[in-house]
Amino acid sequence: MNNLLCCALVFLDISIKWTTQETFPPKYLHYDEETSHQLLCDKCPPGTYLKQHCTAKWKTVCAPCPDHYYTDSWHTSDECLYCSPVCKELQYVKQECNRTHNRVCECKEGRYLEIEFCLKHRSCPPGFGVVQAGTPERNTVCKRCPDGFFSNETSSKAPCRKHTNCSVFGLLLTQKGNATHDNICSGNSESTQKCGIDVTLCEEAFFRFAVPTKFTPNWLSVLVDNLPGTKVNAESVERIKRQHSSQEQTFQLLKLWKHQNKDQDIVKKIIQDIDLCENSVQRHIGHANLTFEQLRSLMESLPGKKVGAEDIEKTIKACKPSDQILKLLSLWRIKNGDQDTLKGLMHALKHSKTYHFPKTVTQSLKKTIRFLHSFTMYKLYQKLFLEMIGNQVQSVKISCL
């Protein structure tokens, strides 16, 4: 008899638990003194507290939590929990307190929580790469670079990189790499030409200068007819009109014209004259010897489609340090349908704090943008443009500036 009673009680307990867990809203058992019965009452939802248990006649009464108090689950408590008052040192408020959530604090970028303190993420030394990036809750995990990989920098983000395959770039292996440095390649001068940039920053600024602020209906046709050298054919002009906005058409036309006439004296003269601009840009940017991780951060900060790690690797191998930023900016422009590189750079500078650029790099990029927009360069662009198209369309361009 006792065994039968025990089984019945266990079954009843399981049935009640199943009922209270599976129904919605969730239920709880409450003994009602007035009727001397166990009642199945509704629990209170998140953001409220239990004001009055249910009765045989009335449902459970719940009331909203007051300011600075919360409950984050269905419950039977007659009071709300007090929100955490402040975040710890080196933390920021990820989510403010409200009636359904406690204040959520998180360590600032580059730090993680260890007991009560936000400690700086570990930086992996040369010869070691990041295998698990640090998070606000976890430290960086480093591991020694395996055979065929290397890391030549101290970084909390950079993984080990694969040794350069010299033969891919038409070069010879002169010194085998190890865990702390890459393979060293050498080759003839022809191999160094692989860092070619189709349109430099100065040329792009010059070509975009040629875009009139006010368009005449036949501006592109006038420009096509008056450009010296080999003419851009009608089919190409129509394709440019179909595929690009009015603001982009002039840039695309001049870019194509330059490619078709690269051996013409007029193009060579323009390139020579614009060397003044190129030398100044090199003075601003060329000295910035950035690591792989810093170059990747710069590319990540640009809007639109990103230049990937593989392209950055190839650029580091094919270009000398002074040309690497310019080459990557050229790749970004091509990848994004010839978007304005200077506008992309200005976007990157607005978000430079997020990506932790070195101060010297930020200053160099700002100086470059100011220089390319300066009155001195404006006068040079105007002079070159009028020399290029001759006197026949001077009045058209000048009226549009």
Swiss-Prot record:
Tissue localization of expression: Highly expressed in adult lung, heart, kidney, liver, spleen, thymus, prostate, ovary, small intestine, thyroid, lymph node, trachea, adrenal gland, testis, and bone marrow. Detected at very low levels in brain, placenta and skeletal muscle. Highly expressed in fetal kidney, liver and lung.
Superkingdom to which the source organism belongs: Eukaryota
GO biological process: apoptotic process; extracellular matrix organization; negative regulation of odontogenesis of dentin-containing tooth; negative regulation of osteoclast differentiation; negative regulation of tumor necrosis factor-mediated signaling pathway; signal transduction; skeletal system development
Annotated glycan sites: N98, N152, N165, N178, N289
SMART domains given in the database record: DEATH, Ephrin_rec_like, TNFR
Post-translational modification: N-glycosylated. Contains sialic acid residues.
Gene3D superfamilies noted in UniProt: Death Domain, Fas, Tumor Necrosis Factor Receptor, subunit A, domain 2
One cellular component term from this protein's GO annotations in UniProt: extracellular space
Disulfide bonds: C41-C54, C44-C62, C65-C80, C83-C97, C87-C105, C107-C118, C124-C142, C145-C160, C166-C185
Ranges: TNFR-Cys repeats: 24-62, 65-105, 107-142, 145-185
Pfam families tied to this protein: Death_TNFRSF11B, TNFR_c6
Protein's cellular compartments: Secreted
Keywords: Apoptosis, Disease variant, Disulfide bond, Glycoprotein, Receptor, Repeat, Secreted, Signal
GO MF entries: cytokine activity; heparan sulfate binding; signaling receptor activity
Induction: Up-regulated by increasing calcium-concentration in the medium and estrogens. Down-regulated by glucocorticoids.
Site label Involved in dimerization, positions: C400
Region forming the signal peptide: 1-21
Domain Death: 198-269, 270-365
SUPFAM superfamilies according to UniProt: DEATH domain, TNF receptor-like
Disease listed for this protein: Paget disease of bone 5, juvenile-onset: An autosomal recessive, juvenile-onset form of Paget disease, a disorder of bone remodeling characterized by increased bone turnover affecting one or more sites throughout the skeleton, primarily the axial skeleton. Osteoclastic overactivity followed by compensatory osteoblastic activity leads to a structurally disorganized mosaic of bone (woven bone), which is mechanically weaker, larger, less compact, more vascular, and more susceptible to fracture than normal adult lamellar bone.
Function as written in the Swiss-Prot or TrEMBL entry: Acts as a decoy receptor for TNFSF11/RANKL and thereby neutralizes its function in osteoclastogenesis. Inhibits the activation of osteoclasts and promotes osteoclast apoptosis in vitro. Bone homeostasis seems to depend on the local ratio between TNFSF11 and TNFRSF11B. May also play a role in preventing arterial calcification. May act as decoy receptor for TNFSF10/TRAIL and protect against apoptosis. TNFSF10/TRAIL binding blocks the inhibition of osteoclastogenesis.
Subunit composition and interactions: Homodimer. Interacts with TNFSF10 and TNFSF11.
Stated name of the protein: Tumor necrosis factor receptor superfamily member 11B
